[in-house]
Each structure stands twice: as structure tokens, then as C-alpha cells.
Amino acid sequence: MKLGMEMVLFIAALVGICAYFFPKAPDTHKSDDIIGTWTSDYSYDTGGVIVRVNGETSYFSNGKYNVNADMSFQPDSATIITFAINGAGEWNIHDKELITTLNALKSAPTKMVYKGKVLESQDFDMMERISNQKIKTIEDFTAPGASQSYIIKNDDHDIKLLEAINPFGKNFNIEMYRKK
């Protein structure tokens, strides 16, 4: 009986030591309701320039997200410049605040309307060759790792209403609709 008790105590001590030196890694798997693919179409003012975003964002359970969208800039009533964007980053939710960090962004100009004249992507290629300069893209003006904060105002399963905290002007709302 004494030998059995010593064996149990020895095994318990061994398990305790192993647990101390080899702790279980924290679970990085997220289960928030935002996981999935969402569509949105919204616009906001950044100090005189109207920005419009129309696209999809996919949030994954590993805390990563991807965004694919058309992003248009309208600095005045006669000019609109549209870019196709593809970005990737990380997301986290704290209480009712969604925080995203954009780690990588690629964009390409797809269309420009100036005083009724439409320039398409092939026209941009020609402009680059003629000017011997690359046309500026959104990532030329965006800091890598830039973060954005959103207040979750409505948290329904298929529709989310976010208030974007806009450091360059008034806050604005974004409605997201679940695609899958």
C-alpha cells in the first residue's frame, strides 16, 4: 500500500513539474460572430475628399483578414479616381470595439473620370510610359501596420453596423452584410 501511495505522489509531482515547465500555449483560435465574408458599400469625407469603398472583407478564426474592394477618391465634382485594392491584416475584438491592423496593401488604378472624360487602366499604362513615372497608388500614402478602430453598434448575425473612428474628419457608419 505504501509503495502504491509513493508511486501516485511521484507521478503527481512529475505531472506538476511538466505542467510548470511546459505550459499549454494560449488558444489563438477565435470564435467571434464576425468570422466569415462580408460585403459593404460606404463613403466618407476626409477633409474635402470623398472616399467610397465597395467590396468584401473576410475575417478568419486565426485573427487574420483579407479585403478586396474598389476604392474611389473624389476630390471635386469633376474628378473621380478608382483603385482596385487587395489588403491583408489582423483583427481583434475588445468588448464592442473591432480593431484592424493593415499589414499589406496592393492597389492599382482602374479608372479616372475627369470632366466627363473616362480613362481606363490601359490609359494609365500609356501615361506611365510617356511620363516615365509610375502612377502613385494607395500604398504609397499608407503606413504599413496602420490600425483602425470601429465601434460595433449593431451586432446581428447577418448584418453588422460599425462606427468607424475617423482621425481625419467625422466618424462614419459602415453596414456589413454577411455573404458566407
State where each predicted segment sits.
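Lipid interaction determinants
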Residues: 2-86, 94, 99-180
